[in-house]
């Protein structure tokens, strides 16, 4: 009897231990704190029209540091003060972030205990140096008005594990212990410069009609930038006609002269891909030019001294001449010229290698400079009719001619205005582009040398 009792007792003990172990690993629902905040807006009275600055703070695990970014409204534009007030012109990013905290309804209140901040990943990034577990640092966004008064601020933590869409996240208002659950997409909360700027450097739209894209592939010796001759590889031109696209290729002979050749299928494909890449030119940073160089590029005139561009040589650019009311250059890595049907031209000059390490990346980067102008030959003068008899007065053909002349003058004026607006945007900056981007813009063509 005693033996049977001991066996039964032992079996009950094993069952109890097994039940405890199962309970410890079973995904029981977490406790929800009852709160009046549930089903109410997280930020009462928040109005996006009052937002004048955006602050982002996130922890970068690879670099083991907190990265910060400030975006500020300046007149009609948003600018990045940390990047010499470069314009943050990614409308999609700005719209998403400014509206990110609007109408955020509290779905649950999960905790009032400060010790749970680690568990839910809502530790303020500002506590980086004292945080025990840095993976618990959340993403912080703060929106302020013109007087730097905070309108709304939120730390976004971990996503809920049982949410298939992974949109529900734990969040906390800085300075408060409560942890809530809201629907929010935190991907836009990033200090990454590239997320805030548009890669459409040429400001091309669906209404813009390309005329042609010309690639001049050559090299200059940076150490002899003043005297170095072009080491030419090829020149390609993609011409966009009304009914078809033509590809013209000239390759360099041993004496450096260009000779037209028939491009093979592979070369044609590469040239077409290069032309297509002009619509999106990603850049990772910007550097300001000297004030004198920027002024001379913003308002080009022949009276400017070439010495205004002296500082550009160490970046791989040398001025060559003033032509068609535009300063023209040679650049260490060749150039790409884009012409549009309205007469506007933009030349992308590819400069020297940027020796500064950026974002702990070992990849090579280059300087890029853009200059806009107008090519009047793209809007040809109308043919003048034969002189009419003195007695006949103004003939119909003469009236048509005068209308065409007036239309050309109008088109050129619009083109010059657009070129001036582009130079206003381009003149201050060297853009930092990757080696991969250079290879897309100015590709190597098999059988052409370089």
Language model segments and positions:
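Secondary-structure "cap/kink" motif recognition
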Residues: 2-450
């Amino acid at each position: 009897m005693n033996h049977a009792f001991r066996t039964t007792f032992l079996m009950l003990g094993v069952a109890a231990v097994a039940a405890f172990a199962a309970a410890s690993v079973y995904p029981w629902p977490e406790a929800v704190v009852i709160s009046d905040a549930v089903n109410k807006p997280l930020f009462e009275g928040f109005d996006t029209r009052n937002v004048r600055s955006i602050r982002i703070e996130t922890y970068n695990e690879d670099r083991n540091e907190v990265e910060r970014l400030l975006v500020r409204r300046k007149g009609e534009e948003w600018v990045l003060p940390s990047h010499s007030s470069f314009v943050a012109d990614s409308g999609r990013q700005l719209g998403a972030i400014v509206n990110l905290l609007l109408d955020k309804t509290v779905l649950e209140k999960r905790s009032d205990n400060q010790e749970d901040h680690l568990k839910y990943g809502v530790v303020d990034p500002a506590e980086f140096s004292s945080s025990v577990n840095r993976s618990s640092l959340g993403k912080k966004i703060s929106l302020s008005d013109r007087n730097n008064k905070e309108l709304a601020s939120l730390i976004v933590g971990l996503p809920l594990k049982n949410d298939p869409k992974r949109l529900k996240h734990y969040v906390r208002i800085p300075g408060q212990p409560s942890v809530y659950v809201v629907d929010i997409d935190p991907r836009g909360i990033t200090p990454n410069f590239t997320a805030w700027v548009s890669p459409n450097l040429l400001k091309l739209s669906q209404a813009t009609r390309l005329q042609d894209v010309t690639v001049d592939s050559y090299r200059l010796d940076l150490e002899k930038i003043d005297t170095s001759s072009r080491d030419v590889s090829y020149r390609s031109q993609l011409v966009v006609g009304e009914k078809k696209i033509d590809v013209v290729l000239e390759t360099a002979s041993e004496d450096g002269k260009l000779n037209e050749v028939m491009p093979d299928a592979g070369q044609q494909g590469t040239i077409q891909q290069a032309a297509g890449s002009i619509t999106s030119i990603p850049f990772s940073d910007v550097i300001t030019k000297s004030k004198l160089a920027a002024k001379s590029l913003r308002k080009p005139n022949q009276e400017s001294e070439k010495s205004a561009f002296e500082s550009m040589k160490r970046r791989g650019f040398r001025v060559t001449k003033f032509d068609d009311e535009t300063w023209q250059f040679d650049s260490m890595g060749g150039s790409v010229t884009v012409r549009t049907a309205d007469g506007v031209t933009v030349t992308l000059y590819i400069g020297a290698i940027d020796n500064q390490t950026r974002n702990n990346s070992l990849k090579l980067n280059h300087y890029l400079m853009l200059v806009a102008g107008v090519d009047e030959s793209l809007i040809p003068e109308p043919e003048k009719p034969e002189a009419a008899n003195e007695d006949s007065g103004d003939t119909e053909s003469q009236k048509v001619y005068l209308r065409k002349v007036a239309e050309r003058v109008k088109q050129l004026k619009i083109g010059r205005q657009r070129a001036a607006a582009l130079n206003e945007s381009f003149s201050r900056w060297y853009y930092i582009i990757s080696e991969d981007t250079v290879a897309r813009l100015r590709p190597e063509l098999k059988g052409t040398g370089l």
